[in-house]
Amino acid sequence: MGIVVLGAVFVDIKGYPLSTYIPGGRNAGRIEQVHGGVSRNVVEDIANVELRPTFVSLVDDTGMGQDVIDKLENHKVNTQYIQRVPDGMGTWLAIFDNDGDVHAAISKRPDTTPLTTLLEEKGDEIFKDCDAIAIELDLEKDTVKQVLRYARKYNKKVFAAVSNMSIAMERRDYLQQIDCFVCNQQEAGLLFSDDYGHLSPTQMAQVLARNVHSANMTSMVVTMGGLGAVYAQHDGACGVVPAKKVDVIDTTGAGDAFFAGTVIGLTYGKNLAQSCEIGSRLAASVICITENVCPRFRPLEFGLDVPVVD
């Protein structure tokens, strides 16, 4: 059944300046509207490596909601567990500067409580034969609890990302039950009540190793933008994965692609360092294009012996 991904769908509204961006001023530019959301991007990234993931989520009961389902089906994502409900999708509004980085953003989260009912009815069917589980940690508490219960029942690995760290902090105790948690440097600072902005990757890796051990977590990865990423495991092993050097067009979705690559590697036999390397390659492929998901790859390009099912 492949990797099961759970989370929310967003509509991304992105504004780009045509000339030098003036904070607080009027800026002529272009505006794009695309399908987004951390987990929606992640499931499409996984599908673009010719793997066949399953998406458990919600969409609006409108034409836009159907468009989201149609696009995912075109990429060979199993969409049978996507429910259509009123106001099922969130909205993310972002303004980019001239370097392709987000200058300001605001989001409206959807109500994801219907996922709890869906998992009560079909949880065994969804998780019994899956290869692994990827989840947004800031879903409803009951939903996260259900997923972790099914993971224990069927002995499945669970990997977690985050879209709103303030909400995810309320689920901090669940991190001990997650096989690998991935977030960025700022989010890691919130998680451990510290400021890591001044640390080099090597220093960050050492700090992370201590924090992962003391918090009784299995493993964790922190992305550091252009400096790459660092990882640490409960046994104290840690390391740095340098970023790939590419021309930046649009950074949207790079973190999601990194998470997708890391999940793919850890699911299909790679160690944490090798998995982060896959994540780094997928992230680089997103940064240098205008899309917020990676282009098509084949598993063998990452040393994965996974049969491609057409």
Located regions from the model:
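Glycine-rich phosphate/adenosyl-contacting loop at the front of the ribokinase-like
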Residues: 1-58, 63-67, 74, 92
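Conserved phosphate-binding/catalytic region of the ribokinase-like
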Residues: 3, 27, 194, 198-310
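A glycine-rich helix N-cap at a beta->alpha junction
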Residues: 71-86
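Conserved phosphate-binding/catalytic loop of the ribokinase/pfkB sugar-kinase fold
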Residues: 84, 94-132, 137
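Structural alpha-helical scaffold elements that stabilize or flank donor/cofactor-binding regions
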Residues: 125-126, 173-174, 213
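Conserved beta-alpha-beta core of the PfkB/ribokinase-like small-molecule kinase fold
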Residues: 132-206, 227-228
